[in-house]
From Swiss-Prot:
Its EC number is 1.1.1.267. InterPro entries: DXP_reductoisomerase (IPR003821), DXP_reductoisomerase_C (IPR013644), DXP_reductoisomerase_N (IPR013512), DXPR_C (IPR026877), DXPR_C_sf (IPR036169), NAD(P)-bd_dom_sf (IPR036291). Keywords: Isoprene biosynthesis, Manganese, Metal-binding, NADP, Oxidoreductase. NADPH binds at T15, G16, S17, I18, G41, N130, E132, G210. This is 1-deoxy-D-xylulose 5-phosphate reductoisomerase. It holds the Pfam family DXP_reductoisom. Catalyzes the NADPH-dependent rearrangement and reduction of 1-deoxy-D-xylulose-5-phosphate (DXP) to 2-C-methyl-D-erythritol 4-phosphate (MEP). Pathway: Isoprenoid biosynthesis; isopentenyl diphosphate biosynthesis via DXP pathway; isopentenyl diphosphate from 1-deoxy-D-xylulose 5-phosphate: step 1/6. Its cofactor is Mg(2+); Mn(2+). The keyword Metal-binding applies. PANTHER family: 1-DEOXY-D-XYLULOSE 5-PHOSPHATE REDUCTOISOMERASE, 1-DEOXY-D-XYLULOSE 5-PHOSPHATE REDUCTOISOMERASE, CHLOROPLASTIC.
């Protein structure tokens, strides 16, 4: 679907990394976009108010409804007028489903699924950075589409694959190759990781991301989730998806075709590029991000993934092959473990170990009906996975 020349846009997770960079892209193209609504968790109320004032939005929502009075006060302080303030998860879902031309979903976590579904059902084009929507509730998400090609992937890897797939038909695809920077601990062995601190893990060598995604990138769980997402978004089985470590983060992913040709998308690491394409596809915008400088000597390297040191990708592959419910448990247990690590309640190696232990506990009960019947069933399973993760964490 071609986006209208002056598109209405709603941004979910506007104060996070994806949201702030999305607004930066939009600010450079005021003739193309009108931001009508912003939603955020509630941790950065002043920033949300400033964004609402700058973009003259009609509605601002916070997941944490106890922050509504603070947001109202901050909006007044920022000089924002006529902004309707709403609070609670239902208000964010309602905003997502209000019928904007484009909804950019930059929410972190599976709480982003219901807003994604609402946006699709309302006919909006969904610029999706919330990979958990696909990982935890894939078929619930896809069945909400009211037309083909309603989802524009915003993750840099999936945007790269999406662009590269234009070079051939689906039948001509031999494999997808997802690239990984390797994170801050590339080259480390498992024994070296026992005493890693949150401060160390939050220092990513190439990307500027939120804390949960940054930790996931360091454990390579993020790459595992991306393999799941790529398989489901592009209908390619997991055995035809490879992962390669590319420390320079210039090649964002590749598609190998049956004739031996490999097509990639390459650019300096800057999330504004996939965000911009997610907002405007199939058209491209000017003045988005820097291109590669081909006048300068450069070396791009690729190396195999060390599955022994970073078992998260193999664990994700196992869950992808098992069922949608396995991938939902993987995601929920991981979110719980990452938060515990950030709060210094769980050692670094305990993150993936906890996730595997929860999956081992729940494996038998997950092997009935592999698909969720509705979001409530998914939510209940995730709650159980989080509870079991907490039990294991508290025993550390």
């Amino acid at each position: 679907m071609s986006i209208a020349s002056n598109s209405t846009v709603i941004i979910l997770g506007s104060t996070g990394s994806i949201g702030t960079q999305g607004l930066d892209v939009i600010s450079r193209h005021p003739e193309r976009f009108t931001v009508t609504g912003l939603a955020a968790g509630g941790a950065h109320i002043e920033l949300l108010a400033q964004q609402a004032a700058q973009f003259h939005v009609s509605e601002a929502a916070v997941f944490d409804e106890t922050k509504v009075p603070a947001l109202q006060a901050a909006l007044a302080q920022a000089g924002a007028q006529g902004v309707r303030v709403t609070g609670g998860p239902d208000s964010v879902i309602a905003m997502a489903g209000s019928g904007a031309n484009v909804v950019l979903n930059g929410i972190t976590g599976s709480i982003g699924l219901e807003p994604s579904i609402a946006a699709l059902k309302a006919g909006s084009q969904l610029a999706l950075a919330n990979k958990e929507s696909v990982v935890a509730g894939g078929h619930l998400l896809f069945s909400a589409q009211v037309r083909e090609n309603q989802i524009n992937p915003v993750d840099s890897e999936h945007s790269a694959i999406w662009q590269s797939l234009r070079s051939g038909t689906h039948a001509e695809v031999a494999k997808l190759v997802v690239t990984a920077s390797g994170g801050p601990f590339r080259g480390w062995k498992r024994a070296d990781m026992e005493n890693i601190t949150p401060e160390q893990a939050l220092h990513h060598p190439t990307w500027n991301m939120g804390p949960v995604v940054t930790i996931n990138s360091s454990t390579l769980m993020n790459k595992g989730l991306e393999v799941i997402e790529a398989s489901r978004l592009f209908n390619v089985p997991p055995e035809r998806i490879d992962v390669t470590v590319h420390p320079q983060s210039i090649v964002h992913s590749m598609v190998e075709f049956v004739d031996g040709a490999t097509i990639c998308q390459a650019s300096p690491p800057d999330m504004r590029l996939p965000i911009a394409l997610g907002l405007s596809a199939p058209d491209r915008m000017t003045n988005v991000a820097a291109a590669c400088d081909w006048t300068q000597a450069a070396t791009w390297t690729f190396e195999p993934l060390d599955d022994e040191a970073f078992p998260a990708v193999q664990l994700a592959r196992h869950c992808l092959a098992a069922s949608e419910k396995h991938t939902a448990v993987l995601n929920a247990a991981n979110e719980q473990a990452v938060h515990a690590f950030l709060e210094h309640r769980l050692p670094y190696l305990g993150i993936v170990d906890t996730v595997k232990a929860v999956l081992d506990q729940m494996d038998a009960e997950l092997r009935g009906n592999p698909l969720f019947t509705d979001v409530e069933e998914m939510n209940q399973l995730e709650l159980e996975a989080r509870r079991r993760a907490d039990d294991l964490i508290n025993k550390q």
